[in-house]
Each structure stands twice: as C-alpha cells, then as structure tokens.
Amino acid sequence: MSLSFRNEIDITVWLSGATIADVAIQPRSRPPLTRLFAGKPAASLLPVLPRLFSLCSVAHQVAFLSAVEAAQGQEAAPATVRHRLTVVVAERLTELLRGLFVGRRALDGTSAAAMRAVMQASALLGGPSEAVPQALRRDAVAQIRTAVGTLGISEDHALASGSALAASVEGCDGRLVSRPLAEPSFLTAANDLDIVARLLADGAAYSDAPDLCGQIPETGVWARRAHREEISSTAAGPAARLRARIAEVAQLCTWLDHGDADLERGIVASYRLGAGKGAAAVECARGRLYHAVVLDDEDRIVNFEFLAPTEWNFHARGPLVQSLKGATLAAGRPGQDAVRALVGSFDPCVGFSLDFREAGHA
C-alpha cells in the first residue's frame, strides 16, 4: 500500500473590500493508520513512522511507544523516560528553529551551517529507544548551544542586533491594520483524557476535525506561553508569535544544557485506558500530539489513531480562522503578505497554499 498522501492545506481568504469576510480551509489528507497497520505486530511499526511523519518523527515514535506500553500495562524505566524527554526536547528545539528560517528567509552561509549543526547534534542524541553515552550527549548539547548563539539567540532570550532573525521579526508586523478580538482558548495536558477517549471512540471522524466541548483550542508555542503567563489576544500577531518561538528555543537550549529544572508539565504523558488500550501525548514543536492504540492478546494492532497539532490550529473554525475573520488589511500586496506571515506563524506541519478572492465572486 502506498504511503503517499496529500500533504498541503488550502486556505482561501474571502474579502469584502479590505475586510476578511470569511476564511475557508481545505485540510490535508491524513494516513489511515488503522487500515494501514491492522493485524501487524506493534513492535514492527516503530521504523515505519518516520516515513509517514517526516517532521517531528521522534515525537511520533515516543508517542507510539508510550501508548503501546500503556496498553500493555508496562512502565518505562526512569532512564528511558529521561532519554525520551531529552530527544523530544532536542527535536522540538530543532523544529522551532527550522520554522523560523525555512521558507521564511534565505540563509547566509553562517546561518545555514549553524542550522545543519543543530540538526546533526539533535540526531546524535539518538532515537527514542537508543540511549547515548553521557560524553556524546554533552558534546551534542554543546554543539546545539553554540549553533543557537550563532543564529543570534542568547540565553536571556534576546536577539542579536542585525541578525537574520531580528530582521525577520521586525519585518513581519504592521500590515494587518486591525485584528478581531477573538477570545482565545488553549489546549493543555489537563485535556488529554477527554481527547484520547474521543479519539478511540470516534477515530478519524474526530481526528480530522477535533473539538473540546465545542471549542477549538490553540496548541503550540503561543499556547505554552499562555500557560506560563497572561497574554492578550491583541498581542498575538506574527512578530509576537516569532518572539515567543525564539524565547522557547533559548529556554529549551538552557534545559538541555543543565537539565535540572522543571520544563513543563506533561511533555510526555501516557494513559492506560483498559486492557489492551493505551494512549499518549507528546508536547512537540507545533503543539500537543496524540497517539491511541488498541492491541489484541498478541500485541498486534487492532486500532491506531493519531491527532496532530495542525488539526487544531488549522481547523475550519479554529485559531487561525478566528485570528483572521473580521481583520482589515492594508491595500494590495502588503496586506496579503501580512496574512501569509500570520499563517506561517502558526507553523503548520505541512505546506499550505493561500488564495485571496472577493466575496460574491465564487
């Protein structure tokens, strides 16, 4: 069976003059995991997941392993839990940096080399089931810290003046003349059990268009920031979202370096839902990722569902749509660029197309 799927989100912005009257989102297609893997041994799936999920593949592997262990009634050893947390954090840092640069700005030679160094060092830390020697871990973390500094991010979350990142932040606000004052809601680990119960009960009907008591909460960097401090919906523009991402990169780098401070609650969480049933949540770069599995008596897959952050943030009634509807744009290309910047600041895990049309001219 082919593992290729339509990996793009189509976004249509309907304009009434300079005002966004509506936003339509055609979601990506998602791999039908139960249909692909029913009857296969759970242990055989781990090497396949990176082929299905090229971004945040470590987070997907950790979520799957944790869900399977929960279904089996097992608990990972403390050293394994710690290693999984480390590789999830390293991947999150790498993906946050990738989103700051890739498709946003052309990298000069120094910045490109620094990005490669981060990606290589993250890979050196190993996969979710591969512990690495402490000396290798220290070298990899030192390489990440040096590369992050080269990219212009300091430990105090400040941006180096004149850096590519500073220029990117400075240039991405100011063209969305006004934004609607939508009341935000944010996904947290406290919502996990409600979500995984729906995921197993309703399958793709839920994961394609999830909700939480009728609401579509935001997940990701901005939601994590909102969990730590009070923020205003009026401050949620592209530049503020980029600054939040940059601040989190610095925070993650510090944690990798020292590793002795509490980072967040529930970065990796698992739940036993009954005999042969388990689920897990992993807080990855773009938000909270869920896996849920049902196994038979021989640990073969009966049901396997997943819910990625993009399904919340790019929901037809979700945070992106609510951030755009009712906004007034500057005229011409600058206004369209402002919309593109806001869409990009939500950091979808797949590509997107953006089309502008006049309402009434469908």
From Swiss-Prot:
Residues annotated as transmembrane: none
Molecular function in Gene Ontology: nickel cation binding
Superkingdom in the source lineage: Bacteria
Signal sequence extent: none
Family in the record: Belongs to the HupK family.
Record's protein name: Hydrogenase expression/formation protein HupK
